[in-house]
Amino acid sequence: MSDNRAQFLEVFPSLVQELRDILAGYGMPEEAIEWYEKSLNYNTPGGKLNRGLSVVDTYALLKGYKSVSELSAEEYKKVAILGWCIELLQAYFLVADDMMDQSITRRGQPCWYKVENVGDIAINDAFMLEGAIYCLLKKHFRTEPYYVDLLELFHDVTFQTELGQLLDLITAPEDKVDLSKFSLEKHSFIVIFKTAYYSFYLAVALAMFAAGITDSKDLKQASDVLIPLGEYFQIQDDFLDCFGKPEDIGKIGTDIQDNKCSWVINVALKNATKEQRDILDENYGRKDSEKEQKCRAVFNELNIQDIYHKYEEETASNLREKIANIDESRGFKAEVLTLFLNKIYHRKK
């Protein structure tokens, strides 16, 4: 485990204790406090923690530190708490998403609602994971001049993510295939709202507020790169689900059988002949590996892989141009954005 990740994980137990103390202060019985603690520990720290860690990394960069190790203990704890607030937001979304999708496993363990005795209580547990964000922000940031900015940022990004989720759920229900509902424009809206805001913009905006870079022009400079970057990231994900090697991506792609409104199917629909369209209409979104292969054959006929590689190079080039024109006069740093782009450009997993 990387040192950065280990140091970040060390902060979490103290936050769980603070949340326990809040419940105890309300006179909550111990069994309920233990339930909440179990939910926090089961659902929050298990992932890659990329979003949370990038708050810390971005803050260090904006403040001019050579590495995270140069932060004082107090400074580190503060930005790590903001990072953990994103991880709590992610946990809240995932617990709810897994119920909506009737998923079985998440991060190599049973989904929370599938754990013995949890079931539908997971709905309330999801709400309580979201509530934890605001408990922690109040305790640690209430006296900061940017406190209201943090609250608005979390509220706005949460609602934007839910809007993306709504459009996704009504566009591509697993049990009712209707490809006429799909389009590249709709796909773009879904991925920007469902993924880009909370996975890319949120971490950088939080680090900016903590570092005192709060001019709306700088927040706009960040979002103007990070939102299209987040869209590019999700398009990569869609592409890899279909064309990535299972040994690279660590899973077998299921988007075709799951009727996902993915970039791949939308590009195919845009370019398909009448015959190819009929094949996709009859075979996409069916739990049948032969039908999946028929879709894949159409994707190959349409040279989706070539279209993707052209898209990737054009997008990366556009983003690099935007980054080159960043105005750093108020303390924002283009390097933050370069690091994000370099992490995902040409990724295989």
From Swiss-Prot:
GO terms for cellular component: cytoplasm. Its cofactor is Mg(2+). Disulfide bonds: none annotated. The keyword Magnesium applies. GO terms for molecular function: (2E,6E)-farnesyl diphosphate synthase activity; dimethylallyltranstransferase activity; metal ion binding. Dimethylallyl diphosphate binds at residues 106, 194-195, 234, 251, 260. InterPro entries: FPS1-like (IPR039702), Isoprenoid_synthase_dom_sf (IPR008949), Polyprenyl_synt (IPR000092), Polyprenyl_synt_CS (IPR033749). Pathway: Isoprenoid biosynthesis; farnesyl diphosphate biosynthesis; farnesyl diphosphate from geranyl diphosphate and isopentenyl diphosphate: step 1/1; Isoprenoid biosynthesis; geranyl diphosphate biosynthesis; geranyl diphosphate from dimethylallyl diphosphate and isopentenyl diphosphate: step 1/1. Mg(2+) 2 binds at residues 97, 101. Coiled coil: none annotated. Mg(2+) 1 binds at residues 97, 101. Its EC number is 2.5.1.10, 2.5.1.1. SUPFAM superfamilies: Terpenoid synthases. CDD domains: Trans_IPPS_HT. Isopentenyl diphosphate binds at residues 48, 51, 90, 107. It comes from the Eukaryota. It is found in: Cytoplasm. Keywords: Cytoplasm, Isoprene biosynthesis, Lipid biosynthesis, Lipid metabolism, Magnesium, Metal-binding, Transferase. GO terms for biological process: farnesyl diphosphate biosynthetic process; geranyl diphosphate biosynthetic process. It catalyses: isopentenyl diphosphate + dimethylallyl diphosphate = (2E)-geranyl diphosphate + diphosphate; isopentenyl diphosphate + (2E)-geranyl diphosphate = (2E,6E)-farnesyl diphosphate + diphosphate. Belongs to the FPP/GGPP synthase family. Catalyzes the sequential condensation of isopentenyl pyrophosphate with the allylic pyrophosphates, dimethylallyl pyrophosphate, and then with the resultant geranylpyrophosphate to the ultimate product farnesyl pyrophosphate. PANTHER family: FARNESYL PYROPHOSPHATE SYNTHASE, FARNESYL-PYROPHOSPHATE SYNTHETASE. This is Farnesyl pyrophosphate synthase. It comes from Kluyveromyces lactis (strain ATCC 8585 / CBS 2359 / DSM 70799 / NBRC 1267 / NRRL Y-1140 / WM37) (Yeast). The gene is FPS1.
